Amino acid sequence: MNVNVINHPLVRHKLTLMREADCSTYKFRTLTTELARLMAYEASRDFEIEKYLIDGWCGQIEGDRIKGKTLTVVPILRAGLGMLDGVLDLIPTAKISVVGLQRDEETLKPISYFEKFVDSMDERPALIIDPMLATGGSMVATIDLLKEKGCRNIKALVLVAAPEGVKAVNDAHPDVTIYTAALDSRLNENGYIIPGLGDAGDKIFGTR
């Protein structure tokens, strides 16, 4: 499976704090931002760089910069917004695209109710952010939308993933790498990840 579990001590520590049943909205939201920042560092390891000249204090020197069009970060509404600040802390020049999905009552498949993409999507790397990868339906649908816009360099950043969701993404889009803080046990009968985090969107926005 094309999944990268980020096994860093700080990531594991912060994720455990988020799993606590009495984790407050403020604490959960703060930890979401902190985890997103740490994980974005790992997900950006293979960014291509190029050399260029700058004027240093002692004259011209050669330095490095990220090559090509600026990354677009793609939060899936609404829970994905909770990870956005953490990624932007690390990559403040990133462009933001947004995808909103809802379940079709007849087919039970996710359909888009809102999408806003930046220009030149076919030239940009994209990083999809969503706290939970459960069934994988929303992630697959978002990747479908990005590829329709010509985007080919796509990664997914999630806090917790279920094996079912990882398999769904890998089956539909084997070229997309998933970065996660934990690959949990399974989904329960209601589609929640076990042990998971509960409803991450409700916890981030204080609507639980």
UniProtKB/Swiss-Prot annotation:
<feature type="binding site">
    <location>
        <begin position="198"/>
        <end position="200"/>
    </location>
    <ligand>
        <name>uracil</name>
    </ligand>
</feature>
<keyword id="KW-0021">Allosteric enzyme</keyword>
<feature type="binding site">
    <location>
        <position position="78"/>
    </location>
    <ligand>
        <name>5-phospho-alpha-D-ribose 1-diphosphate</name>
    </ligand>
</feature>
<comment type="function">
    <text>Catalyzes the conversion of uracil and 5-phospho-alpha-D-ribose 1-diphosphate (PRPP) to UMP and diphosphate.</text>
</comment>
<comment type="pathway">
    <text>Pyrimidine metabolism; UMP biosynthesis via salvage pathway; UMP from uracil: step 1/1.</text>
</comment>
<feature type="binding site">
    <location>
        <position position="103"/>
    </location>
    <ligand>
        <name>5-phospho-alpha-D-ribose 1-diphosphate</name>
    </ligand>
</feature>
<dbReference type="GO" id="GO:0005525">
    <property type="term" value="F:GTP binding"/>
</dbReference>
<protein>
    <recommendedName>
        <fullName>Uracil phosphoribosyltransferase</fullName>
        <ecNumber>2.4.2.9</ecNumber>
    </recommendedName>
</protein>
<dbReference type="GO" id="GO:0006223">
    <property type="term" value="P:uracil salvage"/>
</dbReference>
<feature type="binding site">
    <location>
        <position position="199"/>
    </location>
    <ligand>
        <name>5-phospho-alpha-D-ribose 1-diphosphate</name>
    </ligand>
</feature>
<dbReference type="InterPro" id="IPR050054">
    <property type="entry name" value="UPRTase/APRTase"/>
</dbReference>
<keyword id="KW-0460">Magnesium</keyword>
<dbReference type="Pfam" id="PF14681">
    <property type="entry name" value="UPRTase"/>
</dbReference>
<dbReference type="GO" id="GO:0000287">
    <property type="term" value="F:magnesium ion binding"/>
</dbReference>
<feature type="binding site">
    <location>
        <begin position="130"/>
        <end position="138"/>
    </location>
    <ligand>
        <name>5-phospho-alpha-D-ribose 1-diphosphate</name>
    </ligand>
</feature>
<keyword id="KW-0342">GTP-binding</keyword>
<dbReference type="InterPro" id="IPR000836">
    <property type="entry name" value="PRibTrfase_dom"/>
</dbReference>
<keyword id="KW-0808">Transferase</keyword>
<feature type="binding site">
    <location>
        <position position="193"/>
    </location>
    <ligand>
        <name>uracil</name>
    </ligand>
</feature>
<dbReference type="GO" id="GO:0004845">
    <property type="term" value="F:uracil phosphoribosyltransferase activity"/>
</dbReference>
<dbReference type="InterPro" id="IPR029057">
    <property type="entry name" value="PRTase-like"/>
</dbReference>
<dbReference type="GO" id="GO:0044206">
    <property type="term" value="P:UMP salvage"/>
</dbReference>
<comment type="similarity">
    <text>Belongs to the UPRTase family.</text>
</comment>
<dbReference type="InterPro" id="IPR034332">
    <property type="entry name" value="Upp_B"/>
</dbReference>
<dbReference type="InterPro" id="IPR005765">
    <property type="entry name" value="Ura_phspho_trans"/>
</dbReference>
<keyword id="KW-0547">Nucleotide-binding</keyword>
<keyword id="KW-0328">Glycosyltransferase</keyword>
